[in-house]
From Swiss-Prot:
Species for this entry: Frankia casuarinae (strain DSM 45818 / CECT 9043 / HFP020203 / CcI3)
Name of protein: Large ribosomal subunit protein uL11
Any GO CC annotation of this UniProt entry: cytosolic large ribosomal subunit
Family to which this protein belongs: Belongs to the universal ribosomal protein uL11 family.
PROSITE patterns given in the database record: RIBOSOMAL_L11
Gene3D superfamilies noted in UniProt: Ribosomal protein L11, C-terminal domain (1.10.10.250), Ribosomal protein L11/L12, N-terminal domain (3.30.1550.10)
Family matches, as PANTHER family: 60S RIBOSOMAL PROTEIN L12, LARGE RIBOSOMAL SUBUNIT PROTEIN UL11M
Species lineage: Bacteria, Bacillati, Actinomycetota, Actinomycetes, Frankiales
Amino acid sequence: MPPKKKKITAIIKLQINAGKATPAPPVGPALGQHGVNIMEFCKQYNAATESQAGNVVPVEITVYDDRSFTFVTKTPPAARLILKAAGVEKGSGTPHRDKVAKLTTAQIREIAQTKLPDLNATSIEAAEKIIAGTARSMGITVGE
């Protein structure tokens, strides 16, 4: 007889600093209400993301009915990568009036290549357009 498939009870999406997951909020309460071993998740997440220190790494945690879990790490949010490349703290409050920085097409291509697995795009050109649009909506000029 084949083994039974585990039943999924919850899918939790969090954004946590790489290598710095702790049982404190937001991680503890989100996992605790589903009965997941919080320390075990923190250890596994920190080990999986230690090479990306300094970035915020989104994670999708799948919780099963026997309280076990699996997780998938995603690429850092596009907005964070854009801000890092532009060298600014935050985007513009009025993006179409005040421009806060400028990105080259080479920088946009680099960010698009990083984000491609998580974007809803099949080609690098389409991914570049998505990233460029995000940058423009943050008040960052995209050009040569």
